C-alpha cells in the first residue's frame, strides 16, 4: 500500500477523495521510495530526494495542447471514432489516452487497479470537472478502481459489452523528453509489475463487441506474442487491432 501525507492545507474535497482508496495516512514522508502528498486542492506523487512531482492535470501542459491542437488522429482512426463507439480503457494509468478519447466525444469507462494511481487520476478528473474548458470531456470518463480483467466480465452483465476495449500496457519511453522519462520512472517504480498480458488480452477479446485496440511502440513486440488483425502505425507509436473471438476480419 502507498503512504499519503495529508498537509494541513488540503481541501475537504481532496480529503474526501482520498478516503475512497486504500492508502496509508502518515505524518511525515517516508525515508525512501515514493508517496502521495495531498496539499491545497491537489494530490501529487513524490519521490523522496527529488524536487519534482507527478500530478494528473488535464487543464494545462501536454493535455491542453492535445485537446486544443489535436494529436489524437491515429488513436481516433484506431477506435473508429466516427462511429461513436463506447470505449473501456482497461489500463487507464494517468488517464492521458482516456482523456483524448473522451475529447473525441466518446464515452470512456476507465479501469485502474493501483490505488495511488487511481487516486491521482480521480483527482485529475475532479479538477477537470471544475474547469469550464474541460468539464464536458471529463464528464464522459467514468473511473473504476480495480483490476480490469476481473471487473469487466461483471460489468458486461449489468451494462452490456462495449464496442472497444483499449489497452496501453506499460513499456519503456525511450524517445520521450527527459521530463516525461522522469515522470514514467516515478510511475514504474510506484506500480511495479504490469498486469498479466495474456489474461488481459484474452479478457479484452471476450469483452469487446467490435475490436480491441492495443497501443505499442512502433517497433515493439506484439502484446502477449499475439499478432493483431491489422495495425495503424505512426512515427513512434502504433496501434494493434485485435478482433473479438469469433469475429470475421473481413
Curated annotation (Swiss-Prot):
Q: What is an example of a GO molecular function annotated in this UniProt entry?
A: rRNA (guanine-N2-)-methyltransferase activity
Q: List the keywords (alphabetical).
A: Cytoplasm, Methyltransferase, rRNA processing, S-adenosyl-L-methionine, Transferase
> What InterPro entries does the record point to?
16SrRNA_methylTrfase_J, SAM-dependent_MTases_sf
How is this protein annotated for GO cellular component?
Answer: cytoplasm
Q: Briefly, what is this protein's role?
A: Specifically methylates the guanosine in position 1516 of 16S rRNA.
- Family designation: Belongs to the methyltransferase superfamily. RsmJ family.
Q: What is this protein called?
A: Ribosomal RNA small subunit methyltransferase J
Q: Can you name the source organism?
A: Neisseria gonorrhoeae (strain NCCP11945)
Amino acid at each position: 500500500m502507498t503512504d499519503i501525507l495529508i498537509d494541513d492545507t488540503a481541501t475537504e474535497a481532496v480529503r474526501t477523495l482520498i478516503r475512497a482508496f486504500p492508502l496509508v495516512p502518515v505524518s511525515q514522508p517516508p525515508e525512501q521510495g515514493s508517496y502521495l502528498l495531498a496539499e491545497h486542492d491537489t494530490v501529487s506523487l513524490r519521490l523522496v530526494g527529488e524536487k519534482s512531482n507527478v500530478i494528473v492535470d488535464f487543464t494545462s501542459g501536454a493535455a491542453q495542447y492535445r485537446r486544443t491542437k489535436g494529436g489524437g488522429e491515429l488513436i481516433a482512426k484506431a477506435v473508429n471514432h466516427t462511429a461513436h463507439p463506447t470505449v473501456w480503457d482497461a489500463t487507464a494509468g494517468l488517464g492521458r489516452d482516456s482523456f483524448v478519447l473522451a475529447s473525441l466525444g466518446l464515452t470512456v469507462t476507465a479501469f485502474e487497479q493501483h490505488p495511488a494511481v487511481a487516486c491521482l487520476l480521480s483527482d485529475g478528473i475532479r479538477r477537470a470537472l471544475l474547469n469550464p474548458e474541460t468539464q464536458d470531456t471529463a464528464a464522459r470518463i467514468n473511473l473504476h478502481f480495480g483490476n480490469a480483467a476481473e471487473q469487466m466480465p461483471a460489468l458486461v452483465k449489468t451494462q452490456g459489452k462495449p464496442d472497444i476495449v483499449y489497452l496501453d500496457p506499460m513499456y519503456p519511453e525511450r524517445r520521450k523528453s527527459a521530463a516525461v522519462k522522469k515522470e514514467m520512472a516515478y510511475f514504474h517504480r510506484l506500480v511495479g509489475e504490469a498486469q498479466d498480458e495474456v489474461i488481459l488480452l484474452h479478457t479484452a477479446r471476450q469483452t469487446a463487441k467490435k475490436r480491441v485496440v492495443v497501443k505499442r511502440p512502433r517497433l515493439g513486440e506484439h502484446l502477449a506474442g499475439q499478432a493483431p488483425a491489422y495495425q495503424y502505425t505512426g512515427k513512434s507509436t502504433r496501434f494493434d487491432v485485435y478482433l473479438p473471438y469469433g469475429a470475421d476480419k473481413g
